[in-house]
From Swiss-Prot:
Annotated family: Belongs to the class-I aminoacyl-tRNA synthetase family. Glutamate--tRNA ligase type 1 subfamily.
Gene of this entry: gltX1
Gene Ontology terms: cellular component: cytosol
GO terms of biological process kind: glutamyl-tRNA aminoacylation
Organism: Methylobacterium radiotolerans (strain ATCC 27329 / DSM 1819 / JCM 2831 / NBRC 15690 / NCIMB 10815 / 0-1)
Residues engaged in binding ATP: K243
PROSITE patterns referenced in this protein's UniProt entry, alphabetically: AA_TRNA_LIGASE_I
The UniProt record lists the keyword Signal: no
Protein name: Glutamate--tRNA ligase 1
């Protein structure tokens, strides 16, 4: 076996790239990059009824969005069926596999007998050493592996440790169905061998498959790749992650406003640790990642923790990068807000200018976009209930009073507008908040916003005065 590490991510395109699959891809990618090896991508599309092009596209898009690039061309398993069949025939010719003519009724009876006797259902090997001349007429056989019946099958797993199975408990699995289609077990082994895979990293729900596949590798005289079966992801309640926990596809996390770097960082900490470090740059992840530091216990997905981490990434991101990230989600979230991509240049400039104040409190790009509502809202602004309450007769009176002071400013900035509003409040004998709150309501339509005077600076003199005029027209 070559010393170069080759991992593979092998999703089935029967649905979108879910969060567990994304973490599996990340671990494969990190291990490959850490060791200077390669990560290959194989689409296991042998289930023709459930595999869809939409799911394939979603998987590829999800990986690309997460920044997980693969090496070489994508391998499609279904296209390799002839190769899989040829290997089954090789095993048959070598006496390491055999034709089985057991009927569906016989197999059903085996299962029923096993249940009645309180043992796991398994094929009883009735055609293992039987003369093919005894084959019943009109029955198309399957090809079964002639698996060892004594001793143990052992997997030295990088995460689970030494795992053993008594061979007497593992039956002769089907390699080729009666219609000539290869089974998943055979296809995976042949593809992993032909692709030069040296390290398999996948969920621990595949652990039993490891025994089956190891037997096929051995029957073919091929090296068995090293294996690492990582724990599944559970919800906060300890149950296996499902849609009721919000186990969404990666594309949904994108549209919810999570940054790919933040999601990568969160996913790497689900089951893997490096001391007590929580925040990792991509370079730090690659340098530190080690399969020996992956735990065996199921990791719990915590949306609040993800949101907090995403907020940290937002606060430390460059302002222009955040605006660019917002533009990428506008095709899905923009129409309901009256926005489309690309943003108009003047709005884009205003967003970048406003970003230092906007990003301090936002935990997602959606929150960021909604807190910037005042920049793209159409005049006259729609007021929420709290803002409307602030613009009572008294509030509108304050607006009418402060407006001439603002109009007279020779220059317009956060500092100059703050000075003017403070001066007006003092001359009017009222507190700053009694002027600032109606101003905020008139300029943003809400009672919470980024710092008021930053808002005024970004809106500019003309737009600020126009919005004040909408709420407190001059007589």
């Amino acid at each position: 076996m070559s010393s170069a590490v080759v991992t593979r991510f092998a999703p089935s395109p029967t649905g979108y790239l879910h969060i567990g699959g994304a973490r599996t891809a990340l671990f494969n990618w990190l291990y490959a990059r850490h060791t200077g090896g390669k990560m290959l991508l194989r689409i296991e599309d042998t289930d023709r009824e459930r595999s869809t092009k939409g799911a394939i596209d979603a998987i590829l898009d999800g990986l690309s969005w997460l920044g997980l690039d693969w090496d070489g061309d994508v391998v499609f398993q279904f296209a390799r069926a002839e190769r899989h069949r040829a290997v089954a025939e090789e095993l048959l010719a070598a006496g390491r596999a055999y034709h089985c003519y057991a009927t569906a009724e016989e197999l059903a009876q085996m299962r029923e007998t096993a249940r009645a006797e309180g043992r796991a259902p398994r094929y009883d090997g009735r055609w293992r050493d039987r003369d093919p001349s005894e084959a019943p007429a009109g029955v198309k056989p399957v090809i079964r592996l002639r698996a060892p019946i004594e001793g143990e099958t052992v997997v030295e797993d990088a995460v689970q440790g030494r795992v053993t199975w008594a061979n007497k408990d593992l039956d002769d699995l089907v390699l080729l169905r009666s219609d000539g289609t290869p089974t998943y077990m055979l296809a995976v082994v042949v593809d992993d061998h032909d692709m030069g895979v040296t390290q398999i990293i996948r969920g621990d729900d595949h652990l039993t498959n490891a025994a089956r596949q190891s037997q096929i590798f051995s029957a073919l005289g091929w090296d068995v790749p090293r294996m690492a079966h990582i724990p599944l992801i559970h919800g906060a309640d300890g149950a296996k992650l499902s849609k009721r926990h919000g186990a969404l596809g990666v594309e949904a996390y994108r549209d919810l406003g999570y940054l790919p770097a933040a999601l990568r960082n969160y996913l790497v900490r689900l089951g893997w640790s490096h001391g007590d470090q929580e925040v990792f740059s991509t370079e730090e992840m690659v340098a530190a990642f080690d399969l020996g530091a992956v735990g065996r216990s199921a990791a719990r997905f915590d949306f609040a923790k993800l949101a907090n981490l995403n907020g940290l990434y937002i606060r430390t991101s460059a302002d222009a990068d955040l605006v660019a990230a917002i533009e990428t989600i506008l095709p899905n979230v923009g129409p309901e807000r009256g926005l489309s991509a690309p943003l108009q240049p003047d709005l884009k400039d205003k967003l970048i200018q406003a970003m230092p104040g906007l990003k301090e409190r936002a935990k997602t790009l959606i929150e960021l976009l909604d807190s910037a509502y005042y920049l793209y809202a159409q005049r006259p602004l729609a007021l929420d209930d709290k803002a409307r309450a602030l613009l009572s007769d008294e509030g509108r009176g304050r607006l009418a009073g402060v407006r001439p002071v603002l109009e007279a400013l020779p220059d317009w900035s956060a500092a100059s507008t703050e000075g003017a509003v403070r001066q007006y409040a003092e001359s009017a004998g009222c507190k700053l908040g009694q002027v600032a709150q109606p101003l905020r309501a008139a300029l943003t339509g809400r009672t919470t916003s980024p710092p008021l005077f930053d808002v005024m600076a970004v809106l500019g003199r003309e737009e600020t005065l126009a919005r004040l005029g909408d709420q407190a027209p001059q007589g």
